[in-house]
Amino acid sequence: MSKKKQKQSQVIEIPKPILYTANFLQAISSSLTTKFAAKLFTTPIRHKLPKRELHMERESVQKSIMIPEINKEIVVYEYGKSDKKVLLVHGWSGRGTQLVKIADELLKMGYMTISFDAPAHGKSKGNY
């Protein structure tokens, strides 16, 4: 009897130094622990660009745009050329190129995609 290969889900392990720091802070001050946790939960994690996103990274027209309302600069990706445009928006700790499979399908359908790296995400500067 052969076993079916199960798909392995992605799990982000909490680094031990973070766990040790949180445990130490909890022992001395719940207020400090709360501030530490808030900082962790409001700081995006920057991930290395995977190979599957390299094509979009290379083929898109990239520009930096200043958003005066929040006084932050973001990187914008224009992928393909068409009068029909679709805006793609990534999630927390994401980047504009991570929706490349969707962007490629839209490109085949005759659309140009516009995506961006939110502040402190991908190539955009900053931290929260």
What are these regions (language model features)?
Residues 81-85, 107:
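Glycine-rich adenosyl-nucleotide cofactor-binding module
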Residues 82-83, 91-94:
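Active-site glycine-rich loops that stabilize anionic/oxyanionic intermediates
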Residues 61-79:
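A short loop-to-beta-strand scaffold at the N-terminal edge of the catalytic core in hydrolase folds
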Residues 96, 103-125:
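Conserved alpha/beta-hydrolase
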Residues 2-7:
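Catalytic active-site module of serine/aspartate enzymes centered on a nucleophile-bearing elbow/loop
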Residues 88-91, 115:
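Structural cue for short, hydrophobic secondary-structure segments
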